[in-house]
Amino acid sequence: MNMFNAHIPSYLVPKNLNSNWNVGFILGILLILQILSGLLLTFFYVPCKEGAFESLSRLVTETQFGWFVRLYHSVGVSFYFFFMFIHIIKGMWYSSKYMPWSWYSGIVILILSIVIAFTGYVLPDGQMSFWGATVISNLLEWFGKAKVITFGGFTVGPETLKRFFILHFVLPAVVLVIVLLHLYFLHREGSSNPLTLAEAVALLKFYQLILFSDVKFLVIISMFIGPQVGYGIWTLFQADNDNSILSSSENTPAHIIPEWYLLLFYATLKVFPTKVSGLVAMVVVLKLLIILVESRSKSQAVSTAHHHRVWTTTSVPLVPALFLLGCIGRMVINLDLIIIGIYGVLLSTTFVQKLLDSSRVRA
C-alpha cells in the first residue's frame, strides 16, 4: 500500500502540467478496456479455420450487446494507437529522451502493441486479414524455421489462428508488466513539464487535481469513442470492407490495406524492391525512435534557448516524413510513390543523424 500511495495518490507532479500530460492516463485506461473487452470475446471466439469467422458473426447478430463488444474491441485499438503516437510526439517535443529508461520501456510497449494488434487483426479470418498475414509470412522465408514456428506451417492456415490467438491472449499481460515498469522509471526520475526537465519548485499531489483533470479528459474522449463504435464516423478508424468477407486463398484483393496504425511499416515494405531491403527499412524506422534517446545532450537540460528540445530545423520534419510514408501505405504503388517513399525513409534517417551530431557538438 505504501508503494501504491507513493506512486499514485501522493506522487508529486509539476504544477504547470497541461493536457498533453493526460494522454498517458488515457492510454492506460484504453489498454485496460481493450484487455477486458478481449477477455469477453474469448468466451465466443473459436480459433480454427472453420469457426473463426462464423463465431464472430454469431456474436454480432445473436448475442445481446455482442456487437458493441466486438466493435469496441476493433475500434478501441485505433484510439489506443492514436493516443500512443501523440504520446510519442509529446515525448519528443518535451524532451522525454532525457529519461532514457522511460523512453526505452515505452518503445518496448509500442513494439509489443504492434505485435498484439497484428495478431488480433488476423484472428477474424477475413479476406484482408488473411492476405495481410500472407504478406508477413512471405517476409519470414529468410528466417527458416522461424516462419514455421510463428505461422504453424509454410502458409497461413488453421495452425496460424491457434498460435496467433495464444499470442494475442498472453502478450497483453506482458505489456501490463512493462507499463508498470514504465511508470516506475517515470516516477523515479520525476515527470517532465512544459518548461523544463529540471526539478520543478511548484509541486502538487497527483490526487486530487491532476487525477480529476485526467478523468475529465477521459470523459471527453469517450464522447468520441461512443459515436465511432455506433456509427463509424471516421472511416480511417474502421476496418476495411473486405475484412467482412470470409477469407479465400483463391481470390486476392485488388489492393492490400492494413489498419492505419500499421501503414507506416507496410509502406516501408512496399517502396523497396526486395523483401530483405523492405524488412531492413522497417527495422530502421523502429530504430529511429530507439536511438532518439541517444540525442540527449550531456549538458544541463535547462536552456532559455530551448536547445534541449527537439523543435530544431533538423528534427521537426521527422514527424511529417513518417506521416508521408503512412499515406503511401494506403496507395496503389507506382514508380513515383516508390521514389517518394525511399526519399521519406532517407530523410527520416538523416534528420535523426543530424540530431545526434548536433547533440555531440553541444556536449
From Swiss-Prot:
Cell compartments where the protein resides: Mitochondrion inner membrane
Any one of the GO BP annotations: mitochondrial electron transport, ubiquinol to cytochrome c
Segments traversing the membrane: 23-43, 67-89, 102-122, 164-184, 210-230, 271-291, 309-329, 332-352
Residues annotated to bind a ubiquinone: H187
Record: residues binding heme b b562: H73, H168
Cofactor binding summary note: Binds 2 heme b groups non-covalently.
GO cellular component, one term: mitochondrial inner membrane
InterPro entries referenced in this protein's UniProt entry, alphabetically: Cyt_b/b6_C (IPR005798), Cyt_b/b6_C_sf (IPR036150), Cyt_b/b6_N (IPR005797), Cytb/b6-like_sf (IPR027387), Di-haem_cyt_TM (IPR016174)
Cytoplasm among keywords: no
Coiled-coil annotated residue ranges, if any: none
Keyword check for Heme: yes
GO molecular function, one term: metal ion binding
Cofactor(s) needed: heme b
Binding annotation for heme b b566: H87, H182
Membrane disposition: Multi-pass membrane protein
Protein role: Component of the ubiquinol-cytochrome c reductase complex (complex III or cytochrome b-c1 complex) that is part of the mitochondrial respiratory chain. The b-c1 complex mediates electron transfer from ubiquinol to cytochrome c. Contributes to the generation of a proton gradient across the mitochondrial membrane that is then used for ATP synthesis.
Assembly behavior: The main subunits of complex b-c1 are: cytochrome b, cytochrome c1 and the Rieske protein.
Note: Heme 1 (or BL or b562) is low-potential and absorbs at about 562 nm, and heme 2 (or BH or b566) is high-potential and absorbs at about 566 nm.
Family: Belongs to the cytochrome b family.
Official protein name in the record: Cytochrome b
